[in-house]
Every structure is written in structure tokens, then in C-alpha cells.
């Protein structure tokens, strides 16, 4: 019995020791010895910084030759790709990145440069970007459950806004396209290459306001107003239901659009944006036309009035012009915000559905004559 108890205790101690050793092996710090032996530059020059504490990213770097910067990024091997991006403004779009991974099946590691052209996977292009990489310097290896990705850049001073990312667990890019999937975790920092100090860049406090501005205008001016116009043109056989539906849709669309315009004005004031004058001008024009359309309801002549045909001409054509300007300005706003293909594709699909519906109803109306 005593022998059995002693055996259990020894087993537990060995298990605990194994767990502790594994945790220590998967952890790196600036005080740790770099476990790489085949480096072609003087490692004593390397500066070290805890790049991303929650993910235990450690970045070592140095200017190891004239206009040559050597980097070693280490991170836990979580069966996912790791990446570091170099940005001019702290934003993902337009940045260039170095991404590396080692497949769980024991395959060889891969490191590739990527151009972060947008937020969707299709806009993140391998073997592109504006980083000048020293030939043969891209390499990644796994040591004690930890990835060490190294590369060298030719630059007077690399960009100081750095992006770090961890890919989805179990996914590894593969040939022929080497497309990445959306990362699980991401952060943005700024680094002082002289001191090694890094600071995390907080997410813009205006991101929610931007999204609200876009969605309100998109659903208000860009969808509901169009649906209301379709109802008024093609549903008159259901009188007076069509009229009340038309009023409800246009009023709701106007209120959403008004909210979107107000959000846009607040956003412009907070961001001190200087490249939105055309977008703002179109938005205010659309709002004025919307107000005129709402006021037109109060001045609507009777059907028997000789002025009714002029009112109809005004109401219909101002409405058509409003819709054209609204669609154009929404796409222009998406372009200014660099929102990517998801917004363009989503709204483009909605407009296409509405256009096909309107065309189909027009054809049916023509055939009935």
C-alpha cells in the first residue's frame, strides 16, 4: 500500500514537472537566451521588447549592417500563422506584412510577405508589398513549442507603426494562392527603435460612429427610399394600402437618413477630416431634397386639380434624382472610409436586387398595356 502511494506521488510530481517545463519552454522573454544557432548576424546587437504581452510576442531587432535591419519575432506555437505588419498610419489597409507558419503535420515552415490591401481575405495578397527584404533572410522554426520567425529588411529606418496578428487555430495557408483567413487576435503598436519601447495603439473611439453613419445612410437613403418608390409606382392597385406603405417607408428612410447625416457631421468635427467636402456636400444636398419631398406631402393638390400634374412631375423627378445621388454617395463614402469589399459587395448586392425587382415590375407593367 505504501509502495502504491509513493508511486502515485512520484507520478504526480513528474507530471507537474513536465507541465511546468512545457510552460517554461513555450514562454520567451527578453531575459531568455535566444535558442537559435544559425544566425548570420551578431546577436549581441539585438534589442528586445515585449511586443504583445497577452499573446507573449517577443520582438528582437537590430541594425546589423548599413541600412539593414534584422528582426526575430517569437510567439507560442498555437498551430496558427503569426504575422507582423509595417504601417505608415497604424491602419491595416495599405500595410505590408511578414507572415509565417509551420504546419502541425510536421511540414516545413513558410514565411511570406503580404500586401494588406483590404480587410477581406481576397484583398490580402501574397508575395506583394513594399518591404525590401534581404534575399534568403526569411525563415521560421519551432523550438520548444515556440515559433521563431526571422527576416531582414533594407531600410534607413523601418516603419514605427507595427501590427501583430495570430491566425485561426489549425489553419495554414497553402499553394497555389497562399490566402490567409481572418486573424483570431490582432493589435497595433508603435515602437521607438532607439529605446525599444512600445505602446499599444487604442482602437479609434470613432469606429462605432463611422459604422452608424454608414448603416443609417445605407438603409435610409439607399434602401428604404428606393423600396418606397417601387411601392408607389407598382402597387397602386392596392389603394389606399400602397399609399400608407409608401408614406411609412419614405418617412422611416428619411429619419434614418437624417440620423446618418447628423452622425456624419459629428464625425467630421471629431476627426477634423479635410477630404470629405464632396461627400458632405452630396449628403446635405440629398438631405435638402428629402426635406422637400416630405414638405411636398403637405402641399399635395387634389387629383382633380390642374396643378396635380406639375406636382407629380416635381415629386417623381426629385425622388429619382435623390435616389441616384444617394446610391452614388454611399459608394463614395465606402471608398473614403476604405471599408473594403464587404461593404461594397453587400450594398452592391442590395442595389442589384432592388434594380432587378424594379426592372421586372416595369416589364410586367409594359406587357399588361
Swiss-Prot record:
DOMON domain could bind catecholamines and thereby could regulate the cytochrome b561 domain function. DOMON domain could bind one heme b. PROSITE patterns: CYTOCHROME_B561, DOMON. Binds 2 heme b groups non-covalently. The keyword Cytoplasm does not apply. Heme b 1 binds at residues 213, 279. This is Cytochrome b561 and DOMON domain-containing protein At3g07570. Residues 1-22 form the signal peptide. Keywords: Electron transport, Heme, Iron, Membrane, Metal-binding, Signal, Transmembrane, Transmembrane helix, Transport. One of its GO terms (cellular component) is membrane. Heme b 2 binds at residues 246, 315. The chain crosses the membrane at residues 212-232, 247-267, 279-299, 321-341, 343-363. It is a multi-pass membrane protein. Its cofactor is heme b.
